[in-house]
Amino acid sequence: MLDEIAATTALHSENVGIRGILEEVAAVTGMGFVAVARVTDTRWIACQVLDQIEFGMSPGDELRVSTTICNDIRESGNAVVIDNVSSDPKWHSHPAPALYGFKSYISLPIILDDGSFYGTLCAIDPEPRKLVGPDTVPTLMRYAERVAAILSREAVSS
């Protein structure tokens, strides 16, 4: 039996609007794994996943939140965009890249209409990607805002 957080997260796992956003993020960034994750102070749960690199994660799967950069986003509320972990002075020593095998990374906070933090729109790839630029975060934040709007509408209708 699913607990309340897992059950609520599972409701979003087949939303076609969210799926379309994941596909757009993958196309725009070249990233092979894109997901919406429900992130709390104790949990990281995959809500919906587009996995083109055989990362091996499915909706409902969980990671230990303390091992994720998404946890840093939950704490700070700031987006993180990394072209190449090995040359990024802030993130090269973080345990997540080695643990999960990625070189490039994106994570954006998903803030619901009521102002609460839901989780993140995140993407990883085993190869470095050119992601950092003046338009990157604003463009990707619009995707996160679209996800937030969908999740907020679903919360109102359920």
Q: Which role does the model predict for each range below?
A:
Residues V39, R43, F55-H94, K103:
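Regulatory sensory and allosteric helical modules in signal-transduction proteins
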Residues M1-R64, D135, R142-A144, R153-S158:
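Intrinsically disordered, low-complexity terminal regulatory regions
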Residues S104-L112:
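A short, aliphatic-rich beta-strand micro-motif
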